[in-house]
Amino acid sequence: MASELEYESVLCVKPDVSVYRIPPRASNRGYRASDWKLDQPDWTGRLRITSKGKVAYIKLEDKVSGELFAQAPVEQYPGIAVETVTDSSRYFVIRIQDGTGRSAFIGIGFSDRGDAFDFNVSLQDHFKWVKQESEISKESQEMDSRPKLDLGFKEGQTIKLSIGNITTKKGGTSKPKTAGTGGLSLLPPPPGGKVTIPPPSSSVAISNHVTPPPIPKSNHGGSDADILLDLDSPAPITTPAPAPVSASNDLWGDFSTASSSVPNQAPQPSNWVQF
């Protein structure tokens, strides 16, 4: 059944090949093309290599009609079905067979060395593929013969999964995770934002407050005008050191007191006239 499903594929086609009758081999040494009548081939035609499954077929056909002249099945290469001669790379010896099982050895040759190279490589590639297929099939059979590992659950078997602080098991419920006291933190202000400083409270004293210096008073309570007039007097007026003024006195109160006392003082026209 498998052979019926296999299809035939063409591996190589060469339009010009010569066929020679070869003398029987007298010893174990290889065939020599110089023993053949190379200038008088017994048949010329076309060579075609096909494959069906693992077997390759060398077919000698007529150039015009394509009628089959001879066929050589090849099950192994290199092997007895195809041999190379010892004195040339363009000639080979193949074993042909007919439908009745009879076989014979004939010589074939190519006029071009490149055609002989393609003939040789086509057979090598085919049997290399056959070898790889055999190894793959053997490995697959070994895999099938090995005991399979049963990873399934047995009857009534359960499992327990632990994910972080949440424990889940059959028939149970998961407990919600409580947030810790130090879990939350304030986010920093966005870039470019302004930080507003709150104003100080009324209960906080201002440390940089400066107490204004006291203003000395004259012994007779004169005004600012009197002080200017006294600059031209011949003898300076010495006044005793004023009593220290407390920080609670208002600076503007002293000025108002001096201004209010100006009308009560008598002007000194003599000193102003001399100036």
From Swiss-Prot:
Motif (WXXF motif 1): 252-255
Keyword Oxidoreductase listed: no
Biased composition (Polar residues): 256-275
Residue ranges with Low complexity bias: 167-179
SUPFAM superfamilies membership: PH domain-like
Subunit structure: Interacts with AP1G1 and AP2A1 components of the adapter protein complexes AP-1 and AP-2. Interacts with the GAE domain proteins GGA1, GGA2 and GGA3.
Domain text: The WXXF motifs mediate binding of accessory proteins to the ear-domain of AP-1, GGAs and AP-2 through hydrophobic interactions. Selective binding to the GAE domains of AP-1 or to the alpha-ear domain of AP-2 is tuned by the acidic context surrounding the motif and the properties of the second residue of the motif itself. The WXXF motif 1, which is preceded by an acidic residue and has a glycine in second position mediates specific interaction with AP-1. The WXXF motif 2, which is followed by the C-terminal carboxyl group negative charge, allows specific interaction with AP-2.
Name listed for the protein in its UniProt record: Adaptin ear-binding coat-associated protein 1
Source organism: Bos taurus
Encoding gene, per UniProt annotation: NECAP1
